[in-house]
Amino acid sequence: MQADFVIIGSGSAGSALAYRLSEDGKNSVLVIEAGGSDFGPFIQMPAALAWPMSMKRYNWGYLSEPEPNLNNRRITAPRGKVIGGSSSINGMVYVRGHAEDFNRWEELGASGWAYADVLPYFKRMEHSHGGEEGWRGTDGPLHVQRGGFTNPLFRAFIEAGKQAGFETTEDYNGSKQEGFGLMEQTIFAGRRWSAANAYLKPALKRDNVGIVYGLARRIVIENGRATGVEIERGGRTEVVKANREVIVSASSFNSPKLLMLSGIGPAKHLKEMGIEVKADRPGVGANLQDHMEFYFQQVSTKPVSLYSWLPWFWQGVAGAQWLLSKGGLGASNQFEACAFLRSAPGLKQPDIQYHFLPVAISYDGKAAAKSHGFQVHVGYNLSKSRGSVTLRSPDPKADPVLRFNYMSHPEDWEKFRHCVRLTREIFGQKAFDAYRGPEIQPGEGVQSDEQIDSFLREHLESAYHPCGTCKMGAKDDPMAVVDPQTRVIGVDGLRVADSSIFPHVTYGNLNGPSIMTGEKAADHILGKQPLARSNQEPWINPRAAVSDR
């Protein structure tokens, strides 16, 4: 087998690459995917989002090493093992990122990736339903919508934010990227609108695009150039030849793993694994970043939450309604209200994110209390803690070693304590008076710094937004893995394009910027002139210097 471009991974970025690289019909594209089909309601029905993440069929099922600052717990670290990658098992929340996120990328050496540069790519990829005119794309492959917003708890959350003195925003992906508002979803016509549905499946209808299901074992490098990919499928090993380039889009865990298996990475570590060093790049696997969050849960005194739908019978009713009409509760991820807030005066951008959910529940679908309730997923999203991805062994089937070093920076503790106290302030507003019952979690007895820290050590979890392990930067940056054209430094014919190249984590969910990365990388690969820079300036809170709201 051979193709002009061989893409490893059909996730958020890989699917976008397959679509754009094959668009003019001049180049052949072959996608290598270790997973399989996304057929069936577990992935396609939005309300079933807890299911695919818990199924080994769709999830690599990684765990971190014991985290010393979190009571040595091993933290769940899912990644999609299916067409569409993690966009097929995620929560379907769509966040571009704040303008300051991308300006920071450029400051860190990713020239040409400032907000003015990436905004046109976000517009190109979007088909926005209800977004801010002039700021959003309307004819791209990726459908983005808002939910039905019928539950009164959603309205109470946004009203409580206003009562607490915070801003509201009509579109946090538009000009005003701060405040309380409606959450956007990658859902269309009642179905999860994954990168597979938006990009990969349309691309596979073209004669010049193919897909092979198998495990990428290593990149073949000859005389300093990537010439193909060794894959395993059906118990046999074979090489897929790349006539032009190999593009790695295998996730922030598996992209650095594959580079290291191929001899690209920290020379000392590769030698310890018995792997021949092809390019000594110490940044491969370094700079691992993520978002953490906890659930703040409250009893609802009125029976308006989704608790009534949790029994198996009623879940079956919702599922049947969705199967028949693609409507009803099954057609939403139920994340329909949110907030992006600044933790302190002097910050240009929000650093706290809220997802509001009108039920008190864990991510695996188990009820947190035998009553109606509501919750927020809340986290400090600009942590300075950094971790790493390394090899466990030279066996391509071995899981990578994930050391996040969560909560290793003192500021993280300060910010998460603030999250607990700020959430109590928001839930204590008049808008929640009609619904507010006892606090389920953390619990009203958790008040002091020491009590909050103890709660956090036991209850903080990943928000599943890993990035940064093949950092993009200037060629003279010894820790950069790819240059701003996404080319691997030191190896010809090889690129990386996915969330692993982010120099710094963005302030929200990563599916949107990952797809944007695939879109922009495709233009670099094809040698196209980048889309014209935008001159639009986003809103900055005029009180930012003196107030957190």
UniProtKB/Swiss-Prot annotation:
Cofactor(s) it depends on: FAD
Gene Ontology, cellular component aspect: membrane
Region (Disordered): 530-549
Enzyme Commission number: 1.1.99.1, 1.2.1.8
Pfam family, one: GMC_oxred_N
Oxidoreductase recorded as keyword: yes
PROSITE patterns hit by this protein: GMC_OXRED_1 (PS00623), GMC_OXRED_2 (PS00624)
Sites where the protein binds FAD: 4-33
Catalytic activity: choline + A = betaine aldehyde + AH2; betaine aldehyde + NAD(+) + H2O = glycine betaine + NADH + 2 H(+)
Domain of life: Bacteria
Keywords: FAD, Flavoprotein, NAD, Oxidoreductase
InterPro entries: BetA, FAD/NAD-bd_sf, GMC_OxRdtase, GMC_OxRdtase_N, GMC_OxRtase_C
Active site: H465
Pathway as given in its UniProt record: Amine and polyamine biosynthesis; betaine biosynthesis via choline pathway; betaine aldehyde from choline (cytochrome c reductase route): step 1/1
GO molecular function, one term: betaine-aldehyde dehydrogenase (NAD+) activity
GO BP annotation list: glycine betaine biosynthetic process from choline
UniProt key word Iron-sulfur: no
Function: Involved in the biosynthesis of the osmoprotectant glycine betaine. Catalyzes the oxidation of choline to betaine aldehyde and betaine aldehyde to glycine betaine at the same rate.
Classification via HAMAP family: Choline_dehydrogen
Family designation: Belongs to the GMC oxidoreductase family.
Protein name as catalogued: Oxygen-dependent choline dehydrogenase
Species, as recorded: Rhizobium etli (strain ATCC 51251 / DSM 11541 / JCM 21823 / NBRC 15573 / CFN 42)
